[in-house]
Design a protein with these regions (language model features):
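A hydrophobic C-terminal alpha-helical subdomain
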Residues: 71-140
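Oxidoreductase cofactor-interface core, primarily capturing Rossmann-like NAD(P)-dependent enzymes
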Residues: 1-64, 68-71, 75-86, 92, ...
């Protein structure tokens, strides 16, 4: 079970390695990209319910998304000892997500890097050990 404050919002999660490849491509041809802004998205919009289903599929155990209000989430994290900064940051990201700021998809990762972005299921499969480790440890 994972309580998060994203409601039913849809967004297209992008893998860090895809972001890294985009950054490398831009740095390798900085003149071509000077002054440009690139909105980066993963390949498919998902809700947190769908993310939980993918986690369940890959990890082999039931993962349930529990939507909570942003304020309640911040309080839960406060009780867990998280800093005011991270609580404010996640709260702002959650509000932006609910407001549709992260909605949409595009093909910029592939256009800029020559590689299709990772699907979430592939990312979780590739990094399955990290998700298992997260069950055994809790860092703030």
């Amino acid at each position: 079970m994972f309580p998060l404050p994203f409601g039913n919002a849809r967004y297209a999660p992008i893998a860090a390695e895809d972001q890294g490849r985009v950054i490398a491509a831009i740095l390798n041809d900085s003149a071509e990209h000077a002054g440009k802004t690139y909105p980066l998205y993963g390949p498919k919009e998902l809700t947190q319910y769908e993310v939980a289903d993918i986690l369940t599929q890959v990890l082999g155990r039931k993962i349930t998304y529990v939507p909570v209000e942003i304020e309640a989430f911040s309080e839960i994290w406060k009780e867990m000892g998280y800093s005011p900064y991270i609580r404010q940051h996640i709260s702002a990201v959650a509000q932006d997500c609910r407001d549709g700021v992260f909605s949409g998809t595009n093909d910029l990762v592939e256009k800029l890097t020559g590689q299709k972005p990772l699907q979430l299921v592939d990312y979780i499969t590739k990094h399955k050990a990290a998700f298992t480790l997260a069950d055994k440890t809790h860092t703030k």
